[in-house]
Swiss-Prot record:
Segments on the Cytoplasmic side according to the record's topology features: 230-344
Protein name according to UniProt: T-cell surface antigen CD2
UniProt membrane topology term: Single-pass type I membrane protein
Segments of this protein annotated with the region CD58 binding region 1: 56-68
Region (CD58 binding region 2): 100-114
GO BP terms: heterotypic cell-cell adhesion; natural killer cell activation; natural killer cell mediated cytotoxicity; positive regulation of interleukin-8 production; positive regulation of tumor necrosis factor production; positive regulation of type II interferon production
Free-text description of this protein's post-translational modifications in UniProt: N-glycosylated.
Species in which this protein is naturally found: Mus musculus (Mouse)
Biased composition (Low complexity): 264-274
Glycosylated sites: 82, 94, 135, 166
Length: 344
């Protein structure tokens, strides 16, 4: 019974000893697009080290052996004097993985064995900060980077920390500037902003002022349009009146002026319009006696003769011609012994 107990005890001890002999894992971070050097943690090259071997996915990629040239699977790799492995090519995401390093002494014993977990990360970009005053909300965002953490500070106080590309925060005061920081194992970027927002009362007055200004502008525009329409209406009415005046003048000119009567024509018309006296009627002028019949006949013929026209008067040259004198006959009731003078 005692033997069984001792056997089980030694078995457990041996298992625990094997577990303690397991290889340690070390994480090494690389930058996307850049080379990397894999250093051996807690190791220093000494004269009793004979060999350093680097293996990736079961394949020997590089080997350092004392008194022999180093073995390199390609020119991409290089073993340094301290035993570190240098990868010269720009690292890509698919270059992430586990690299195993084994160190042997001159006696052939294993001095060290470690697994290095290589992870390739993208550097973070500079954060951006924007805010909205009506909502009192601030947003911090990062566009590029992998496996980073976003942190927001106000002054020296950490407000929030999240492993995501954007983060929002609703502030209660603006006593200190805000700082947004993005960080991952291979890079770190930050940005600081001072947020300025008008107070609510001021924004209310600004809104009221803008509204009143807009209303006043609308009224001024309406008044301007009204004045323009009124002026156009007045000009149109004035043009209509001018057209009416021009039309009346044109009709008057087309009718022509009435002919003015000359004194000679007026006298002729008056003579022509006078009705001849009835037969047997004799005109008597006060203070004169009636003329004899022969004289009346000659005088009546002279009265009927039309006066010369204005054209004939202007065409006649020289002094006017003398008219024959007519001697009046003595009245019938005069004495028989009175003799008439001889005619000229």
């Amino acid at each position: 019974m005692k033997c069984k107990f001792l056997g089980s005890f030694f078995l457990l001890f041996s298992l625990s000893g094997k577990g303690a002999d397991c290889r340690d894992n070390e994480t090494i971070w690389g930058v996307l697009g850049h080379g990397i050097t894999l250093n051996i943690p807690n190791f220093q090259m000494t004269d009793d080290i004979d060999e350093v071997r680097w293996v990736r996915r079961g394949t020997l990629v590089a080997e350092f052996k004392r008194k022999k040239p180093p073995f390199l699977i390609s020119e991409t790799y290089e073993v340094l004097a301290n035993g570190s492995l240098k990868i010269k090519k720009p690292m890509m995401r698919n270059d992430s993985g586990t690299y195993n390093v084994m160190v042997y002494g001159t006696n052939g014993m294993t001095r060290l064995e470690k697994d290095l977990d290589v992870r390739i990360l993208e550097r973070v970009s500079k954060p951006m900060i924007h805010w909205e005053c009506p909502n009192t909300t601030l947003t911090c965002a990062v566009l590029q980077g992998t496996d980073f953490e976003l942190k927001l500070y106000q002054g020296e106080t950490l407000l929030n920390s999240l492993p995501q590309k954007n983060m929002s925060y609703q502030w209660t005061n603006l006593n200190a500037p805000f700082k947004c920081e993005a960080i991952n194992p291979v890079s770190k970027e930050s940005k600081m902003e001072v947020v300025n927002c008008p107070e609510k009362g001021l924004s209310f007055y600004v809104t009221v002022g803008v509204g009143a200004g807009g209303l006043l502008l609308v009224l001024l525009v309406a008044l301007f349009i009204f004045c323009i329409c009124k002026r156009r209406k007045r000009n149109r009415r004035r043009k209509d009146e001018e057209l009416e005046i021009k039309a009346s003048r044109t009709s008057t000119v087309e009718r022509g002026p009435k002919p003015h009567s000359t004194p000679a024509a007026a006298a002729q018309n008056s003579v022509a319009l006078q009705a001849p006296p009835p037969p047997g009627h004799h005109l008597q002028t006060p203070g004169h006696r009636p003329l004899p019949p022969g004289h009346r006949t000659r005088e009546h013929q002279q009265k009927k003769r039309p006066p010369p026209s204005g054209t004939q008067i202007h065409q006649q040259k020289g002094p006017p011609l003398p008219r024959p004198r007519v001697q009046p006959k003595p009245p019938c009731g005069s004495g028989d012994g009175v003799s008439l003078p001889p005619p000229n």
